[in-house]
Amino acid sequence: MKLTVWTYEGPPHVGAMRVATAMKGLHYVLHAPQGDTYADLLFTMIERRDHRPPVTYTTFEGRDLGEDTAGIFKVTCQEAYDRFKPQAIIVGASCTAELIQDDPGGLAETMQIPVPVIPLELPSYQRKENFGSDETFYQIVKSLARPMDRTPEVTVNIIGPLALGFRHRDDIEEVKGLLYEMGIGVNVVAPFDATPEDITRLGAAHANVLMYPEHAESAARHLERICGQPYTKTIPIGVAATHEFVAEVAQLCGVEPRKDLSRLRQPWWSKSVDSTYLTGKRVFLFGDATHVKAAARIARDEMGFEVVGLGCYNREFARSIRELAREFDVPALITDDYLEVEKAIEDASPEMILGTQMERHIGKRLGIPCAVISAPVHVQDFPARYSPQMGWEGANVIFDTWIHPLVMGLEEHLLSMFREDFEFHDEAGPSHHGGHSPKPSEAARTPDKVEERADPAPEAPQTGSDVMVWLSEAEKELKKIPFFVRGKARRNTEKFAADQGLQEISLDTLYEAKAHYAR
């Protein structure tokens, strides 16, 4: 264990919470101390759900450890059933409660509760949140789903979307639209908005559409084995992947692969005038494996970007990410340490980051534009509007999301370049007022002060700005370098000056460093 200010994944019982919160008629009884009771905060503040998560805690205290904590669990479990009357109950322990080894599953089985009670064995000190969600959904499906007659019409189950997922709500609607265009019905969507009764009907579908392997691949494999239902392997994120997804579903279900491309604008926009100064931009990708794999191919094949680094935080998918990295001829970063991610991004010096909420913070620190492509995300990535990532509309949304940081970044660079111009400096009036604009002050014509938005300082103290003095002329010239490579230029210049034994960086030093590293 280690102390950190950020984690990409919580303990596995958080994954179980996400499944329980996504479903209806299911209740989660969690054996946990007071400090582990944060589900309400996760789902009502961040995801802005209009109801509290169906989680009941035993909330034992330190003084209870010398008494019967197992008895506390049994009382809590019975009270939860009496109050909420769920169709099924899942029981488990938090990472802290796991240490006292009360066996919530075994205790619940002795209580004669008249609904299915599904025990969860989630090893908190070996696995993490995505494993918890995958294992929880698998145990629910294993306990409730059975083989049955197929529906008369061709139908599929959509499995994988859950609470706190990145655009899961909107992705469901987009995937449904793709299926309806081919005349394929939807039998059950699970776990999102499904009840335990719905889970018992999973076996009636002809196939399963697996939206997010992180959360439902174990369940999909189980249904394939027990119910004879094949499942899709293609994730429809991006134009090419959506075409492949439609073809795969059509083949599994034996229907014609019909497509309505009238809503698709991304290919035209990516070929438009805007793209002439976006092609070849260097991007770094990090997030969950599903979204990183999709984003890497979109970046290279549909946007014309150059992928300079990629990685994921969920080690269960490390092998596939390493294979992808070999395809792109870049190193694979498999880590859940945000400091390692920041170091890799700083070393790669990309022009844009595609990542999670943490990469958004890293981008701000390093002065690099960032677009969010993967959970974990904060409240701004649970929009009220329709904003999918999958399907045709998802391709449009992705184009806007990725391009706008670059466009606005270029605009910001132009503004900073011309800030000292006699016509555009901060104290000049609106340019369309002509001769009525006030004259620039002497200070505005010769600004010596440094902008408040400082460039990120490098980590290495021997080459950092704490031992180097930048003269005003060199500082002003440095600001003319685009912000997305300015940090690298600063570091190279300071390293060059340190190698030359210089304590001050003049305009000549800057030019000499540029010539040195251009060789």
From Swiss-Prot:
Substrate binds at residues 409-410. It is an enzyme of class 1 (oxidoreductase). The keyword DNA-binding does not apply. It comes from the Bacteria. Pfam families: Oxidored_nitro, PCP_red. It catalyses: chlorophyllide a + oxidized 2[4Fe-4S]-[ferredoxin] + 2 ADP + 2 phosphate = protochlorophyllide a + reduced 2[4Fe-4S]-[ferredoxin] + 2 ATP + 2 H2O. The keyword ATP-binding applies. Residues 445-456 have a biased composition (Basic and acidic residues). Its cofactor is [4Fe-4S] cluster. One of its GO terms (molecular function) is oxidoreductase activity, acting on iron-sulfur proteins as donors. The active site is at residue 274. Keywords: 4Fe-4S, ATP-binding, Bacteriochlorophyll biosynthesis, Chlorophyll biosynthesis, Iron, Iron-sulfur, Metal-binding, Nucleotide-binding, Oxidoreductase, Photosynthesis. InterPro entries: ChlB/BchB/BchZ (IPR050152), LI-POR_suB-like_C (IPR013580), Nase/OxRdtase_comp1 (IPR000510), P-CP_red_C (IPR042298), Protochl_reductB (IPR005969), Protochlorophyllide_Rdtase (IPR016209). Its EC number is 1.3.7.7. Pathway: Porphyrin-containing compound metabolism; bacteriochlorophyll biosynthesis (light-independent). [4Fe-4S] cluster binds at residue 36. One of its GO terms (biological process) is light-independent bacteriochlorophyll biosynthetic process. Residues 426-465 are annotated as: Disordered. PANTHER family: LIGHT-INDEPENDENT PROTOCHLOROPHYLLIDE REDUCTASE SUBUNIT B. Belongs to the ChlB/BchB/BchZ family. Protochlorophyllide reductase is composed of three subunits; BchL, BchN and BchB. Forms a heterotetramer of two BchB and two BchN subunits. Component of the dark-operative protochlorophyllide reductase (DPOR) that uses Mg-ATP and reduced ferredoxin to reduce ring D of protochlorophyllide (Pchlide) to form chlorophyllide a (Chlide). This reaction is light-independent. The NB-protein (BchN-BchB) is the catalytic component of the complex. This is Light-independent protochlorophyllide reductase subunit B. It comes from Jannaschia sp. (strain CCS1). The gene is bchB.
